[in-house]
């Protein structure tokens, strides 16, 4: 929209001139004055408007003050009509009608209204003059009043989990800080230090923020959940001059740590966010700052509304002129199960290095838990960590071998070592000598014979290994609805690299989610596509050219059952309930033979992957975590 144009201004001047030239003969029409007033209302400069016993500068100042809260909002003024009151004599009067339109936001909806101004003919000067009051700018506006637009927040949607569980909802909090207006300047520093000590936070930053704030400012120190975790009694706060405890409700997960790397945080927009938003986010707005809260901000937040009202000089509303109701945000439906996620997080609390546990429901691919250990916070190890999967990848290599003609009963050779292009590979320390030599493929997987799967990868070739990974849901683009990585298996490796790939080292990579997907695909009898956001559910990735068949999954499951029955995960064979199948894995990642520990297991409609960055071995470090999880999971 544009303001009154220069062409319009020129025509106004011309009409005024014509009016003065013809004054001697024919009484002028009020059109020129009416159009000059339209120009003045648009610019709030009335110096070119003939006024009746009024000062142009005073009128400009009065209306500028009245419109100041919205002065930067684009608006246009157009003259709609001018009607002379034929019944009037001296002075002659007329009424000018104007349409004023405000462009309130980026939408197509504007605020338009009609207003009027009184015009009187001055016999002495032979000109029409405007007689103005504040209502000429806004109907109903009186002296010493102003208009303002106030935002009306939309209700933010919840984040809900498996079976519509309430995960992120508004929960009671306490905003605790120092109200400088209710304490003396001499108390500000000592109160800030005392409050910091009570809250067990650093004192210097709070002292500095208090000093920098205005004399009547409330300086927030911390936000605490108003639940059983808040143990500081109110009387402790009351003993510190100026401390104020404000009650509020904000979107929060069940606990502070609950899926935090995935769900993310919600809070006041930073200066950087405000600047980058190009006006869509304003200082003080609360938005999603990370994770799903940020990624689905528009869905959750909805659209704020607003009101435009007349206020008196005491800032009290007098009349509401316009109301645009907010559109509430929509709930975000995800697949995390509250109890399953909390169990996974509690078990990982015992780990001292980067770790993760992911649980997937094989029947539909729903991610029920995606927990990252405390040492990885805020990193999302569960969904984004890229690591060599070690011997858990032998399930993929086993599929490539099955497709290359082997069966679980095929006799394969498991030597203690094997050489590939001059590089010697060996089995892990402590590999049972009874499982060396000629053994069934199922036994090679049960005891995790490196040399068998190195040779198997070399015979199957890299494209077949990559295709087997795709069939098990690993070598695909993620379709979870959230930031995630599944896995990467190249189709052009040869020689030593290909041999190392066959045992989950080399250049293959997987996330904990990726290996949980492999296990889930075996349990499901078909390729599983894991997903976290249930509504709207993301589109599935392109299907494998050679998808996993039910027979292939059955063969893999039978071999993984032997891993638990008498192989590297035999400590899990006493878990009650439905049968457990699995595979352990160890991936050395440096010259000192430090290793990542892995375990994948399935039981019923549950597939689990456990990863620990620094471990003594998959069965020794990750296996007990998987066992505890399956034992305690309901």
Language-model features: where?
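Secretory targeting and sorting signals
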Residues: 1-26
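Short, low-complexity, disordered segments immediately C-terminal to signal peptides
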Residues: 16, 25-39
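Short solvent-exposed beta->alpha transition segments
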Residues: 29-35, 46-95
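Second-shell loop/turn segments in exported
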Residues: 36, 52, 103-106, 146-150, ...
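Extracytoplasmic/periplasmic proteins that interact with beta-lactams or build/remodel peptidoglycan
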Residues: 75-80, 90-354
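Gly/Ser-rich catalytic serine loop of serine hydrolases
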Residues: 156, 384-393
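Beta-lactam-recognizing serine transpeptidase/beta-lactamase-like catalytic domain environment
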Residues: 312-321, 354-386, 400-614, 618
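Short, gly/Ser/Thr-rich active-site loops of penicillin-recognizing serine hydrolases
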Residues: 625-634
